[in-house]
Every structure is written in C-alpha cells, then in structure tokens.
C-alpha cells in the first residue's frame, strides 16, 4: 500500500496544471511546440487515471452536447452512448495504441482519432474523430467532474 494517499487527486490536478502552464507560455519560450503531443500524454492524467481508479463514479448519463461531443465526431459507437462507455473506449484506445493524430490542412494537427476493439475481433466497436479543441474541453470537464467525486 502506498503512503501517498491522495495520488489520484494530485495527479489529476497536476495534469490540469501542466496544461494551464503550457497554454500560458509564449511560442518563443517553447521553441518547437508540441502541444498536441503534450495533451495526448496528459490524457493519461485527465481520462485514464480517473476512469481506472474511480470507475464506479464515472457518470452513466447519456453523452450529450453538454460534454462538447457532437454526433458527427462519432463514427462507430456500439451500444448505449453513455459517458462511462465513451470514456472506457477512449481509455482503451489510448492504452492499446489505437490513436492517430490527423490534419485537415496538412500544416497542423486538427483532429485526434480513436479506435477500440472487442478482444479478438478485427472490426472496431468504437471510432471517434474529434477536433483537438473539443477533446481538450471534454478531457478537462471529465477530469473536473471526477475530482468533484473524490
């Protein structure tokens, strides 16, 4: 057992803090910007850790516009569209490396694509193509929602 009892809370808060600090930096301070790479790494702290650690507290509400997830972002989603299932699919996509960064204009990353598969099957059960800004909003809102439950 760890002597660090508030790991989950601190990890989520610190991950949110990392994003806030990065957003406040000027491009000149950063040299090359890797904000999307940083954000995808931060998804571990904003989505994966909360989903894994306090799974029973993940909302089972229907996924709706209040979460900034539009229907046209979702290409495949088998079963009921709940926040709990949506987050589980994103967690699986990240954990199993089924994630792609894509561009609409070939000069910058504009979207993140996630796929999730049922074990042993070749066809995805979930596919999402979401604009980076919408994913950031969702991840922050999800992390803050989960913090309120800890």
Label each PLM-derived region with a short phrase.
Residues 1-25:
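Charged alpha-helical initiation segments
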Residues 28-81, 141, 145:
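Short, contiguous, well-structured surface segments enriched in hydrophobic/aromatic residues
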Residues 50, 108-150:
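Amphipathic, Lys/Arg-enriched alpha-helical patches that create a basic surface
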